[in-house]
Amino acid sequence: MRRPDKSHFFILLLALSLLSACKRNFQYSVLEVKPLANDLNQQAIDRLTTIPQNDTFSFLIISDTQIAYDELEAFVKHANQIPQDSVAFVLHGGDFTDYGANFEYNLYYDDIKKLKFPVIGTIGNHDMLGNGRGIFNRYFGPEDFSFNYGNTTFIVFNSNSREVAFDGNIPDLDWLKTETQRAAKKKNIIYLSHIAPISLDFDQTKAEPMARLLSTTANSRLSIHGHSHSFDYSEFFDDGFPYLVAPTLLKRSYVKVNVADTTLTVEELFY
């Protein structure tokens, strides 16, 4: 009688344990495109129209949540303890994923769908790897868009120049200029993109023109970014215009911005 091969039992046991222990979505191929949701940014913007808006409000910023799944889960639990009327929404500074894989987007969604506040995000450079850009478009919608909250316009755009080999198309400064003109009657304009113009991953032929556009637009108040993983709030070009870089969520920190008419205050918070 043939004895059973113990190695087969071990492999079977390992497989069963992995399947039973896995509480998150599983992906059979890194090329798989099966998003769990669509047009998340527009859904969040639509939610904003259902709540009272005024010129005094606060919002939170998180960024670079790739591989920070435990920290993201903890942030959601932390933020859900914040009173609903003290925060309007959350901005995400990009890099939802590390490799642009569908399962990474799904892992992010598994956690963020439990957050009680609307979340609006910009595309990060890691989100453009592989077929990640297409998945981002399905999950979140357009890369360049704007929305209003009260008397403030938020302009969100792709600034990941290196991912397109600095071909001159990212960021789209013509589109950006048009959006600032459309928002001319608003009290404030706040910008959101992943890579700040001082980074070498930003097309340096566009850095000064963009900085000049932002600093000379009368109602421009703040430009928000991620990418560098460390908190920074300063003038990058000595032109009086402030830039804010949000830290990676791996540091268990995020940023709160308070808007009071045309005055903004910024604070880094930990949880």
Label each residue range with its predicted role:
Residues 80-89, 164-241, 267:
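His/acidic metal-ligating clusters that form di-metal
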Residues 22-107:
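N-terminal active-site segment of His-dependent metallophosphoesterases
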